Structures are given as structure tokens and as C-alpha cells.
Swiss-Prot record:
Keywords associated with the record: Isomerase, Oxidoreductase
Tagged with keyword Aminoacyl-tRNA synthetase: no
Protein name: D-erythrulose 1-phosphate 3-epimerase
Lineage, uppermost ranks: Bacteria, Pseudomonadati, Pseudomonadota, Alphaproteobacteria, Hyphomicrobiales
Species name: Brucella abortus (strain 2308)
Induction and repression of expression: Induced by erythritol and repressed by EryD.
Length: 310
């Protein structure tokens, strides 16, 4: 199997809401088959009847267009403490929330759900004993979600390494250390990472920790999905792969594919994670610039466009 290209729906949140509008735009205008669906489109906290209706609507749109939801991820309004929250009842809420999310994604044909491993407060992260206690609690929370997700037909759950210690996975060494611990937890289905090659602690003494290519060489065997965007030296945003950004960006197809291959990539999903400001003219450039980004990668990574029905 070959690498496949997908899109995280972050930049489509609020700009689209109805399943038909979202999915038809992806097929017709972006010419891309695979989506990582963020939770805002079918929010697990909504009423069950609303979730069921919108999930049915989205599934019909997927069947009609050939678009696929491959996974579910928390979106721009879901970067929260979750299983790192100090309050037990709040953590309980999010365990149930992610179980519902797993059901939604499973019903849409996706194979995984995830978010950050946990986000700790200053207070909890800075206390070594409390930090370790809360890490164990977070792993237990994920194990419960994984057990439910297995029943929903998912293949794995995932965590996203970030760029600071209290969000976890901030260096390659810390990232692999936590991954080893999660693998050893032997959950009902595996918990893999979903690495973003543009993340990493820019204050690290090891330059590999903020080198996208070093991450690309390291993570493929433990990161079925890998986020990419056009990386600038200032780490200034989730830039699209447009001609203007490509001219000054670090990420180019040939060296990136070489790095992935060196890391053992075989059938990984390479997921575009982009964002656009709610300002003019950016707000109306979203679809054209994502389409340009997809077209930029199309000669190198399978977009699945041949499977689209519109």
C-alpha cells in the first residue's frame, strides 16, 4: 500500500456545518477522498437524537460522493485538559464524551479517534508526584475509551504529541517514552501517536526536536496518521501548500517522502492540518488554498480522487 493524503477539517469549522455542504465541497472543490473529521460537525455533547440524525445525513453524503471519514479528532474548540483535568467528575464527563465520539466515527466508517494525551495545569505538572499520579489516571481513562472504541469497530485510538511538557510529547525522546508506556498498557486496541512534524519544543538543546524532517524519520512506525503543513522557520502557523508559502517554506515533497521512507512509512495517512484567520481576504481563500495544497501533493501522495463519485 502507498501513502494516502487526507485533510483535518479544522479550517472548515464554522465555514461549513451541514453534512451535505461539507462533504460535497470536499469532493467537488478539493478533489480529496479522505477526511479527519473534527468534533464540531457532530458534537458528542449534543442530544442523542441530533447526533443520530446528523450522523445518518453525513453517512449518506459520504456514500453519495465517495468521500471517507478515516478518523475523528478534537477540533479548534477542543484543545482542553480532558483526561488531565484535576477534577474527577470532569474527567468522567470526557471519558463518556470520547466514547460517544468513537460511536459516531465508527458509524461513519472511521477507524480511530483521538486528541492530546492530556493537558495538565501548571500546578499539576510542576509537582512530580502529582504529575505521575495524573499520568496514570489519564492512561486509565484512555484504556476505558479504547475498550469502548473496540466495540464500536475502531482499530486504534491516538494521542497527538505537542510542543510543551504539560501537553506531552514535546521532544522526540519524551514522545517515544510516552508511546512506549502506552504500548505497554496493553489496551483493548492499541494507542498510537498522531505526530505533527511541525511540533516540538523550540527551546530544546537538541535541534532534531523542532526539525520536521527529524520527526518524519522517527515516527512513521508508531504514527499511522501524520499531520503536515508548510513549516516556516518562525513556526508561525498552519500554512497551506500554496506557491507563495512553498517558496519560503521548509517542506518539499522529495525530501519529506525520503524522510518518511527512511522512517519506515508504508501506508501512513499524511494529513493536511491547516488554518486560516477569520479576516479578509483569508476567510474566502480557504477552499482555493486547500485545493491548491491538495493539488500540490497529488503527484506524490494518493489523494483518492479516482474514487470520488462527483
Amino acid at each position: 500500500m502507498a501513502l494516502t493524503l487526507s485533510l483535518n477539517t479544522n479550517p472548515l469549522v464554522n465555514r461549513f456545518a451541514e453534512p451535505d455542504d461539507l462533504i460535497e465541497t470536499v469532493a467537488r472543490d478539493l478533489r480529496l477522498r479522505d477526511l479527519q473529521l473534527t468534533h464540531e460537525f457532530i458534537n458528542p455533547s449534543w442530544q442523542a437524537s441530533t447526533i443520530r440524525r446528523l450522523t445518518r445525513d453525513m453517512d449518506r453524503a459520504l456514500q453519495r460522493t465517495g468521500v471517507r471519514v478515516t478518523s475523528g479528532m478534537t477540533g479548534p474548540y477542543g484543545r482542553l485538559n480532558h483526561f488531565g483535568h484535576p477534577d474527577r467528575d470532569v474527567r468522567r464527563y470526557y471519558v463518556d464524551w470520547f466514547k460517544t465520539f468513537a460511536d459516531i466515527i465508527g458509524d461513519l466508517g472511521g477507524k480511530s479517534v483521538g486528541t492530546q494525551f492530556a493537558i495538565f495545569t501548571y500546578k499539576d505538572f510542576d509537582d512530580p508526584a502529582r504529575r505521575e499520579e495524573l499520568i496514570k489516571i489519564a492512561i486509565d481513562c484512555w484504556a476505558e475509551v479504547a475498550e469502548h472504541a473496540a466495540g464500536a469497530g475502531l482499530d486504534y485510538v491516538f494521542w497527538e504529541p505537542m510542543s510543551i511538557g504539560r501537553e506531552f510529547g514535546e521532544t522526540i525522546a519524551e514522545c517515544m517514552k510516552l508511546q512506549d508506556r502506552l504500548t505497554a498498557a496493553n489496551m483493548a486496541i492499541p494507542m498510537w501517536m498522531m505526530a505533527d512534524i511541525d511540533h516540538g519544543d523550540v527551546t530544546s538543546a537538541n535541534p532534531d526536536d523542532y526539525d520536521p524532517y527529524a520527526w518524519a524519520r522517527t515516527v512513521p512506525k508508531v504514527s499511522p496518521i501524520i499531520h503536515i503543513k508548510q513549516s516556516l522557520m518562525d513556526k508561525g502557523g498552519h500554512r497551506p501548500f500554496t506557491a507563495a508559502f512553498n517558496a519560503k517554506g521548509r517542506i518539499q515533497p522529495e525530501p519529506l517522502l525520503k524522510a518518511f521512507a527512511e522512517g519506515g512509512a508504508v501506508d501512513n495517512e499524511i494529513c493536511l492540518e491547516l488554518s486560516f484567520k477569520e479576516r479578509e481576504p483569508n476567510d474566502r481563500e480557504v477552499i482555493p488554498q486547500i485545493a491548491e495544497s491538495v493539488a500540490f501533493w497529488a503527484p506524490h501522495i494518493d489523494t483518492g480522487a479516482k474514487d470520488l463519485k462527483i
